[in-house]
Amino acid sequence: MSAIGVIGGTGVYDPSIFENIHEESLMTPYGEIDYVQGTYKGKTVIFVARHGKDHTIPPHKINYRANIWGLKKLGVKFIISTTAVGSLNKNFEPGHFVLTDQFLDFTKNRVTTFYEGGNRPVAHLDVTNPYCPELRQIIESVGKEQKLSIHNGGTYVCTEGPRFETPAEI
């Protein structure tokens, strides 16, 4: 059975809702990741704190490739990633959940691919639908059952941190 991966962003660091918790680390070709493994309702969950367990890794220093490679190595098929963000959409209020369906990546100094040349042929990733529609549908259904304010669809815009956007960028 596949594990479920959770990458927790700012404000999501407490995996205590899981049972049978144990902390581990894994060396990947891209560096080491720390993670917490546990179970939730009988499912194996692998939790990675995006900014590190002590919230000390700034956005531009996060080892995204190690996190993703490590989760795949650990048997994760689905990843739920949380983040605390602002919104330009007045319908998205604080505390609402937005299931993004598109993204704009305005970062400049982050590695964005596993491909670095060499013996492997060039690979181009199709990001027409960058987020899994089936997983988004499951999350939306569960969110509605739980009476959460949930929006299915939104564009995540990522700018280079660690800073907030300028008024012109917004």
Predicted regions and their residues:
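Active-site rim beta-loop-alpha module in soluble metabolic enzymes
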Residues: 130-170
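Metabolite-binding pocket within alpha/beta catalytic cores that recognizes anionic/polar moieties
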Residues: 1-127
